Amino acid sequence: MARRTWLGDRLKPLNSEIGKASPGWGTTPIMGALIALFGVFLIIILQIANNSLLLEGVNEGVPQSPAGQGYGYYPQSR
């Protein structure tokens, strides 16, 4: 026989709706919006890493990455 615990008693109501489906679309629009926002976040991160997104005052004086200089990376001699 399974032992009853305080945590189990607290979590039991969360599992009482098992097997029942929510009518209509449920939380699908919220999930779609969050996926879209995550996609925008990933695109912004990609553009920053690729130096194709210019930010005012952030990219000034910063050398470009090797990807931004072309296929070969040739450091300048001192």
From Swiss-Prot:
Keywords: Cell inner membrane, Cell membrane, Membrane, Photosynthesis, Photosystem II, Transmembrane, Transmembrane helix. One of its GO terms (molecular function) is phosphate ion binding. It holds the Pfam family PsbH. One of its GO terms (biological process) is protein stabilization. Its main location: membrane. InterPro entries: PSII_PsbH (IPR001056), PSII_PsbH_sf (IPR036863). The keyword Cell membrane applies. One of the components of the core complex of photosystem II (PSII), required for its stability and/or assembly. PSII is a light-driven water:plastoquinone oxidoreductase that uses light energy to abstract electrons from H(2)O, generating O(2) and a proton gradient subsequently used for ATP formation. It consists of a core antenna complex that captures photons, and an electron transfer chain that converts photonic excitation into a charge separation. This is Photosystem II reaction center protein H. It comes from Gloeobacter violaceus (strain ATCC 29082 / PCC 7421).
